[in-house]
Swiss-Prot record:
Keywords: Nucleotidyltransferase, Transferase. Belongs to the UDPGP type 2 family. One of its GO terms (biological process) is biosynthetic process. Pfam families: NTP_transferase (PF00483). Its EC number is 2.7.7.9. One of its GO terms (molecular function) is UTP:glucose-1-phosphate uridylyltransferase activity. The keyword Lyase does not apply. This is Putative UTP--glucose-1-phosphate uridylyltransferase. InterPro entries: GalU_uridylyltTrfase_bac/arc, NTP_transferase_dom, Nucleotide-diphossugar_trans. The lineage of its organism: Bacteria, Bacillati, Bacillota, Bacilli, Bacillales. It comes from the Bacteria. It catalyses: alpha-D-glucose 1-phosphate + UTP + H(+) = UDP-alpha-D-glucose + diphosphate.
Length: 272
């Protein structure tokens, strides 16, 4: 079973400037909880026991959020309001942190988790993407596919043509309903995307991915892309793509973030 997950949270959040100069996108409010709280809840519900958050020097708010605040607890106790904390408890899960000195891409961030993974398969969950499913959590769907096929699996969502340039897009061969054997993957295609199936911020990797990441050189923008590592592994390994059930919200896109807030207000309850 997959028990470890990496959350890469060290980037500058340039798609959400200028607010991300002071507030990490992972801490954007969704109701009374920040984005990353929902993500950690999903991991907990999927059976994850240990999380490694890859952060940078400007992401201390994330660390503070998951830490205890004795001063706040004492204040609430004095006012007989401790129930306010119990209404939205921090998930009971082990969280570790590592500092990424420079924002050098998703692949670089994942490489900081090699020791944490310890030679075992592991999950990667991007904090840009919230996926709410009425049934099985998104990562749980991937873990189920990995358990069956014992190979790396990428979470996919069918995506509108005009939005495909934001994501890695696969070319795949159908294996069963909702599951594809990946033949190619293109990072943020500007034209002629190979399909409408885009990476949805959920991955299960075998430890071999670290060898591929170490062999890569940074791209023209100075970043190491996990898409390139996946593409490089396709000759020697089978990588699957799993269509995920549930509603996806890309927090980096203002239209998605606003839609999430609207959907919450419309239903008058959290989307879970």
């Amino acid at each position: 079973m997959i028990k470890k997950a990496i959350i890469p949270a060290g980037g500058f959040g340039t798609r959400n400037l200028p607010v991300t100069k002071v507030i990490p996108k992972e801490m954007f409010p969704v109701g009374s909880k920040p984005v990353i709280h929902y993500l950690v809840e999903e991991l907990k519900e999927s059976g994850i026991e240990d999380i490694l958050m890859v952060v940078s020097s400007h992401k201390n708010l994330i660390v503070d959020y998951f830490d205890s605040s004795l001063a706040l607890e004492a204040f609430l106790a004095s006012k007989n309001k401790l129930h306010l904390l119990r209404e939205h408890p921090i998930p009971d899960i082990r969280i570790h942190y590592v500092r990424q000195p420079y924002a050098k891409g998703l692949g670089d961030a994942i490489s900081f988790g090699k020791q944490f993974a310890g030679g075992e398969p592991f999950a990667v969950v991007l904090p840009d993407d919230l996926i709410f499913s009425a049934n099985q959590p998104a990562l749980g769907q991937l873990i189920e596919a990995y358990t069956k096929y014992q190979s790396s699996v990428i979470g996919l969502k069918e995506t509108k043509t005009e939005d495909l340039h934001h994501y890695g897009v696969i070319k795949g061969e159908p294996v069963e309903k909702g599951l594809y054997r990946i033949q190619d993957i293109v990072e943020k295609p500007k034209q002629n995307p190979p399909s409408h199936f885009a990476a949805a911020g959920r991955y299960i990797f075998t430890p071999d991915i670290f060898n591929e990441l170490e062999a890569l050189e940074a791209d023209s923008g100075g970043e190491v892309q996990v898409t390139d590592a996946i593409k490089a592994s396709l000759g020697a390994c089978t990588v699957y793509g799993k269509l995920l059930e549930g509603e996806r919200y890309d927090i980096g896109l203002q239209k998605d973030y606003l839609k999430l807030i609207y959907d919450m207000l419309k239903t008058e309850k959290n989307p879970q």
